[in-house]
Amino acid sequence: MMRELSNKRAIAAMPIAGSYRAIDFALSNMTNSRIQKVAVITQYNARSLNEHLSSSKWWDFGRKQGGLFVFTPTITAESSNWYRGTADSLYQNMQFLKQSHEPYVVIASGDGVYKLDYNKVLQYHIEKKADITVVVKNLEDRSEIGRYGVVAMTEEGRITDIDEKPLETNLSTVSTGIYVIRRRLLIELLEKAAEEDRHEFVRDILVRYKNIKKIYGYKLDTYWSNISTVDSYYRTNMDFLKKDVRDYFFKQYPDVYLSLIHISEPTRPERI
């Protein structure tokens, strides 16, 4: 796990390729996908993440109609409502979902390093008439496949089985922790999960409804890495020493943005 490195900062604020933070990749994807309203939900050590998010103009999004919102658990003298899982973190911020007007929601983990046009996932979601679309990735290296939710899919892309962190499996396609779902359906599923004292998005929504709802997998064929362990965090940073990886992220459209606070030289461009 990442406790050795993340005991003083959120994983989403961990440095990647020098100047970047892990969350920059997901937020850049959202900016490039023209998403106007973004909520960042964080549990522990939020200060460094908040400083990072507030320091860059690239995260302004659409302030008139949307904007960037950061939510942490509500801690009072009477109670401490720590998030008990991804579904619970969304449920505890239900008011944000209910006050929004957008028909669809993109849920994305802050510890993934990748490029993705979420509009393409949404288009796929609509074409398939899916209830939930999961962005999936085929792993060539299966040594750490037990860290992920492993999925079985039909040729048409429908997910027929989801095995969360299996000890053994012959499958190699995993969930990246990126989902597209209609907002009203998400609210309905979260409220149902809360009524039943269920808190995990994968186990208590995806697995629970895999045979009831139409869940499809959108295949991501480009670079993707998850930095939730020390080994994967090290390997991801080592990947950026490779020219093809650097060129893919920093020389090919769309851009990856970062905050000026992390640039050491004033003459260096803020958009790479």
Question: Model-found features: residue ranges?
Answer:
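Catalytic-core segments of class I nucleotidyltransferases/pyrophosphorylases
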Residues: 98, 102, 106, 113, ...
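Conserved beta-strand scaffold positions in the cores of enzyme catalytic domains, especially
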Residues: 13, 67-70, 215-217
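Residues that form or immediately flank small-molecule/cofactor binding pockets and catalytic motifs
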Residues: 18, 73-75, 137, 164-167, ...
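Residues at the starts of beta-strands that form the adenosine-phosphate
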Residues: 36-37, 131, 214
